Amino acid sequence: MKPMLKDFSNLLLVVLCDYVLGEAEYLLLQEPVHVALSDRTVSVGFHYLSDVNGTLRNVSVMLWEANTNRTLTTKYLLTNQAQGTLQFECFYFKEAGDYWFVMIPEVTDNGTQVPLWEKSAFLKVEWPVFHIDLNRTAKAAEGTFQVGVFTTQPLCLFPVDKPDMLVDVIFTDRLPEARASLGQPLEIRASKRTKLTQGQWVEFGCAPVGVEAYVTVMLRLLGQDSVIASTGPIDLAQKFGYKLMMAPEVTCESVLEVMVLPPPCVFVQGVLAVYKEAPKRPEERTFQVAENRLPLGERRTVFNCTLFDVGKNKYCFNFGIVKKGHFSAKECMLIQRNIETWGPWQPWSPCSTTCGDAVRERRRLCVTSFPSRPSCSGMSSETSPCSLEECAVFRPPGPSPVSPQDPVKSNNVVTVTGISLCLFIIFATVLITLWRRFGRAPKCSTPVRHNSIHSPGFRKNSDEENICELSEPRGSFSDAGDGPRGSPGDTGIPLTYRCSASAPPEDEASGSESFQSNAQKIIPPLFSYRLAQQQLKEMKKKGLTETTKVYHVSQSPLTDTVVDATASPPLDLECPEEAAASKFRIKSPFLDQPGAGTGERPPSRLDGIVPPPGCAVSPSQTLIQKSQIRSTGGRDGSSERCHSRSSLFRRTASFHETKQSRPFRERSLSALTPRQVPAYSSRMRTWDQMEDRCRPPSRSTHLLPERPEHFQGAGRTSSPLGPLSKSYTVGHPRRKPDPGDRQAGLVAGAEKMEPHRAHRGPSPSHRSASRKQSSPIFLKDSYQKVSQLSPSHFRKDKCQSFPIHPEFAFYDNTSFRLTEAEQRMLDLPGYFGSNEEDETTSTLSVEKLVI
């Protein structure tokens, strides 16, 4: 066995040596695969052995294309070159296919070449990779599109016969799988020749395929059937899709236009719907605002602006193809809607002329959200002719017709004249009023008393008259006087409750004679005088010599009425404030002269002061004032105030200012009540000594007494009375002042008054003796005859009952003449009584009217 293996090994070694050392011929390709049209060359390696004699023969390498069965080129080897590499350029490889490299040796005997197929090389050539794309053109409305051809392979630079490319496009209306069921498909081909480049866009026009269009693109070399690259079929609707042409934000004025941009080569046919912005929460449901259908080939549609809400809101538009039933386009936008519309027409204006051809005009306003820049479309005004009467053909000769402005001018003149006349009347009225108020010197001053009930507006009472001389201004018959000032609290205090500021405490001793020294002659108002005359006549008819009447007193003294006789509630002798006084009081027509100081007043004491020289009046109006001055310890020592009473009061002053609960007064013709006796201070003077006429009272005259010695008496006390004291100061009686001392007594000051009498005497003459007596507890009331003269003698005095000036002619001295019996009956002085035993009841004061 071993010898057999040894022999076989030797045989293999001989064969191997023969192969290695023997002759070998071959062709070798570096790259078996090549890219057509590329810029790379093909390299082929060869090895060829010479013959036995060592001579070289001619050898060539042939490039043969198998697809076309033709030789493309042949290259020869050098004679003395047994091995090497041959280069084949890129332009030999224009198409993809199979290529062969074959070595062909030369035969020596006859010179023919026989290819050695056993000694050949195979080359595979492929097409380069081209990318095809479709795109919209700038003229999308024209129905065109673009085909792009791109490759990343570097192409060969053909020196001659550079090949061209051919781009073929095939349009169809359906996909290949649907052709059998729907019949013969519609195909439209379009080709374009182009140069061989690495990338380019080739534009094609659209074929009228329909709503659906499919495109297939193929790339070939010109003149060849082989396809370099192809793509398709491509659904253009899916490739490009539908687009809605609209701005992101638009202001809707009248209508909103929306344009649908379809894919290239596709006709529009579908539904365009409008939805409000999608809700933010999923549970909310969107609602459709409107929907418009687009017919075949129509790309534009409009929506009315009234469909959208006022303001800025977001809406979405969806377009869908009818066949597919789904929306393939959606766009959202902000729509601003403003209110811009025309308002109603205004009425027609009047015709421009009164005759002939005329026109009229009417206007309307633009209602808009932006009044500063209204943009309503249309005319804001319009005109129309007016059909009026024909104008007169023949006109009378004369001046030119008046222009339409002349009536307006005449109307203006009338208006200006009327206004001027009205202004003149107003101006004249103002001047007359000012002249009446400031142009004349006032006959009498008009002092007022604050908080007056009968004159709340500080006016002169209706029943007051001026009794002063023409050359001397006097104070008005008001409720307040111009006398000396008292304390600030004295203003507004009733007349009968004002304390004397000039009387010292020791003057209480002279209270017994204060009855005669405090008489006052006054003139009654007209209504009171006539009322007295009427009462006297009634008494005469009834045969009465004495009677009592109670009158209801209103704020207007002219409306006093008679009521049944009644008892009056007691007076408040604690000096109440004016605000608590009764509104049914009657105010004095003369000036009140409050005292210079205040003091404390015991209850059931009445105060008064001596009056200054006043107007001379008739003795028929003389009233007897019974007064008594209380002692004062200091001006600010007590919280309760007593106020001095002025001597210049009217005859109705006996109706005291009382509380509001006393709306009635009692009036008597023969007797007086005991508690409300006002202190009159002017009776002490006689008519014989009053030769001078009345003079205006001076404020400075009554401020301080001229003769202080008259206020000093034997019974002077050193301590003042307390505010709640019930005791009375004991005074000594004074003598009755004679007529010579009367003037000094008037200026001296106030005298103290005695307390009220406990009973009434038959006459003032009988009471005068008892009044001069004094008591350790209180002074006895007494009366004294006031005057030595009879009323007839007083009437003869030159100072009449009424002023003789023509201004006072209304007071007729002869209108109130009485009979002799009435004269004798009424020739009694008034007197005041007092009843201190009954402190709870009292009647309103009454007065005696002496004619």
Swiss-Prot record:
In the UniProt record, what gene is named as encoding this protein?
Thsd1
- SUPFAM superfamilies hit by this protein: TSP-1 type 1 repeat
Q: Name one GO biological process term.
A: focal adhesion assembly
Q: Which residues carry this modification: Phosphoserine?
A: 462
What the entry lists under InterPro entries is as follows: THSD1 (IPR038877), THSD1_D2 (IPR056218), THSD1_D3 (IPR056219), THSD1_N (IPR056217), TSP1_rpt (IPR000884), TSP1_rpt_sf (IPR036383)
**How does it associate, per the subunit comment?**
Part of a complex composed of THSD1, PTK2/FAK1, TLN1 and VCL. Interacts with TLN1.
This chain belongs to which protein, by name?
A: Thrombospondin type-1 domain-containing protein 1
Q: Name one GO cellular component term.
A: endosome
Q: Which residues lie on this side of the membrane: Extracellular?
A: 25-412
Null mutant phenotype reads: Some animals develop hydrocephalus as early as 8 weeks after birth. A few die spontaneously at 9 weeks and have diffuse cerebral hemorrhage not seen in wild-type littermates.
- How is the protein disposed in the membrane? Single-pass type I membrane protein
Q: Where is this region: Disordered?
A: 471-516, 626-646, 682-777
Q: Which residues form the TSP type-1 domain?
A: 339-392
Q: Where are the transmembrane segments?
A: 413-433
